[in-house]
Amino acid sequence: ATQFSSLMNLDVSHFYQAVGMEGGKNFYCVNGATPLLSAMLSLRYVIADNALEANPIRSFVAGSGNTYLYENKYVLPLGFMMDENVIEAWDYSDLDEITAQNKLAELLGADETMLTEIPSESVVGESTIDVQEDAYIFATYDSTTVDSLTEEISDGRTKSFTKVSHGYTLDLGYCTAGTEVKIKNSSEERVNIT
C-alpha cells in the first residue's frame, strides 16, 4: 500500500523491513511475505502473473488472460490474540529477517526451525540453488544496486522481481527435489543469495 507519508505509521514500514518484506518512507507491501507472515497479515488471496503458483499452501482459484488468483490455505482471522509473553520476548531489532521469523515461530510453539538455509552458488550475473528436497523456497541477498532479478526454474517456471534494491525476501515458490533454481540479473553484478 502506498500512502501520503504524513498519514503513514512508519513503524509498520520498519516492521515490514525487519522481517524481510518491502517497506519504505511512504509505502509498504507484501513482497517478501513468507507463509507465517501471510497468515498473520490475513493475506487470503494472491494475484500473480504466473500460471504455476499452485502448491501445497496455495490453491488456484481463477484466471483471466495472464492474471491468476490463488488462495492461501493457512490464514489467521483479521483479529487474533498473541500471548503477551511472546510479544515481550520477540526482540527482532538486532536479527536478520530470517532469524527474526524463526524466533517468532519458536516463541509461538513451532517444533522445528521454520526457515533453514539451502546452499547456493553465486557468480557474476547469476546465482544457483540446487533443491535437495521438496520445499517452499525463499531467498535473501546481499545489498545490491540491481533493481530487478529474474528467476528461472528447471521445470520451466519463470518469475521477475522488481525493485529488489528495496531489500525484500524473494519468494521463489514451491520446488521439488532435483530442481535447479537460477536467479539472474542483467547488470552482470554478483548478487549473493542465501
Label each residue range with its predicted role.
Residues 1-194:
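Soluble catalytic regions of membrane-associated enzymes that act on cell-envelope
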